[in-house]
């Protein structure tokens, strides 16, 4: 039986512990799955955009700081923010870059060709980027993505925050296959779990 070739899309070398666990799981199932490369989306920072958002970023960093202190009392979740070098599991990195045309971000043709040469069966999105159609077309079966939140109510980041803010009883999640509408796709699985008092606990 032919092995499924899987790639993970990230932002840089260091990833959260959940992406690292996923990479290790793929490696451990080497009779059915194979992952020889990961894709890192990297782009130049827009300084004007950063300056416009600086107050929001400072405020959110404070929330993260205090919630992270609270997480240290939860043995299971205390490493929620820990970053791990993905290259320890998957050695080869493919760097691709985005460029902007109007309100759209696309990838350079040479980068798309690099991804095509890998002949991935499936890509898994584990980054903060909206995936454009040119990257979707590089795989045999498409790109899978996990989302926190009930998509009928909340579509924006940060994950797990808005349900706490609006005091929702439950928090949704879904796994979807991304399509050309970019921010939506075909839902493969979805469900709900109880909303916790702090969004870091809920997103961990």
Description of each model-found segment:
Residues 1-204:
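One-carbon transfer enzymes
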